[in-house]
C-alpha cells in the first residue's frame, strides 16, 4: 500500500510508528507543503492520501477539490486529518472518506486492513 501525506508540521510517519502502526509493508511519503500537489499525487499514485487542511500554499480542502476536478485517478482512501474538526467536516463533505484529528490517525482501521 502506498501512502502519501500532505502535512506541514507533524511527522506523520513517526506519529504512526510511535503509536504502534506497522509500516514495514507500506510505502510512505510525506510532503511538508502542497506545492505542485497534483503532479506529486500523479507521480506517487497513492492508495491512501492524507490531507492536512491548514498547509501552505494550498489548503488540504483545495488540494482535494483540485484532485476531484482533475483527470488523476482518485486514491482508494482519502483521509482529512486536520486538528480542526470543522476543517475535517468540510473535507468529508467534499469527498474525503475519513475525517480525524491528526494526532489520532493511528486509530484508523485502514492500518490493520493493509499492514
Predicted regions and their residues:
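Acidic, metal-coordinating helix/loop segments flanking the phosphotransfer/catalytic sites
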Residues: 30-48
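Conserved acidic segment of CheY-like receiver
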Residues: 1-12, 16-20
